[in-house]
């Protein structure tokens, strides 16, 4: 990998572990629960986070194993499985897998010669479409070796309930260094102890958690109602407009888009195809600036342009496509 990457620390010693705060919650949030259970009802909507890295050469296998083991100490969520409460009464609970095995989650394969980058992408596609074993921590990684030019490919797949995109970047950062030599005395944490949590136990934890949160929720509700009432007396029109604005925002979130969307994507299957289009960040920034937009604007415009050409190739004309935009809620 290039040594100029500003997102990769010089070594693991330079990692600020206090910044790796995700994965601390014992219980899934409502959003994470939705992502976890959605694929059971609609498998076509599976959306794992898949990161594909192209390496100039294959890393030492034992060092890679050690790096992932170390990362599982720093981020305990890596060692955790999701336990559904009895009858799904509540949100799933994260529990340390008593049978956690790095060798199950991290594998390697050597492609038969001749092998180019497209052959490696086919392996990535297979990994991306395999459903997770929900009795284990929902992530997997694969080192693909044997490319004709000496390069290697490292692909990591994580379930969206584990973390968001920013958390995924943090996790990948933990596995990298700009120094080729091993890092001694890097900061470490004691791995969490294995647990044997059952669905009944998960339900019990949910009940206890809700009881503990109830007083604070009631207090917040009372304070909120008092503040709204006071504001309504002093500025009734402002309060009414804020309430209506909130209601409209909520309606936009929970109401499905009015448009039918793409006829080509409506009945899509479980298969996926991977391809690459290389564009340098400086070139993309220059194009965005020329059009009066941001880097993100240019990226989204390129995606929509690709969808437009895809539909044209199949003789379909679509004026608009509903899309979801992930937004980082981190502070």
Please give the residue ranges for each predicted region.
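Soluble acyl-CoA-dependent acyltransferase catalytic core bearing the H(X)4D motif
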Residues: 2-33, 41, 48-331
